[in-house]
Design a protein with these regions (language model features):
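Small beta-barrel nucleic-acid-binding modules, primarily SNase/OB-fold domains
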Residues: 1-129
């Protein structure tokens, strides 16, 4: 069984998995697209749901985080979901923990994809409010 919690967390067969090395906006977090308020956290979740489709992600565990969630990189048809989300502009490379997805982030930024075409707050700043 699979449930997508948000843009960077899934529950796979009862195990809560947090994608390592990336950070997506919180579900209640908004971005500004011109004058329009966009729920970019929900957009990230929807993009992930669409990307997974009817597939079952294969996850490579990298240990646990402070919240006892499994940290992992998950793949669908051989493609990293983390890299996909960052490259689409709906997740950020979590530089504090990993430099793995910086190139994907630079690609999204250069091409103004996803949140890079909007005004946004980094999720780690948003959570401090």
């Amino acid at each position: 069984s699979l449930r997508v919690v948000d843009g960077d967390t899934i529950v796979l067969n009862g195990e809560k998995i947090r994608f390592s090395g990336i950070d997506t906006p919180e579900l209640k977090q908004t971005c500004m697209n011109g004058d329009e308020k966009v729920f970019c956290g929900k957009s990230a979740k929807m993009l992930l749901i669409k990307k997974i489709g009817n597939e079952t992600p294969e996850c490579i565990s990298e240990g646990r985080d402070a919240y006892k969630r499994t940290l992992a990189e998950c793949f669908v048809n051989g493609e990293s979901l983390s890299a996909f989300l960052v490259r689409s502009g709906y997740a950020f490379a979590y530089r504090k923990y990993s430099d793995k997805f910086i190139k994907d982030e630079e690609f999204a930024k250069e091409n103004k994809l996803g949140m890079w075409s909007m005004k946004f707050q980094y999720p780690w700043d948003f959570r401090k409010i």
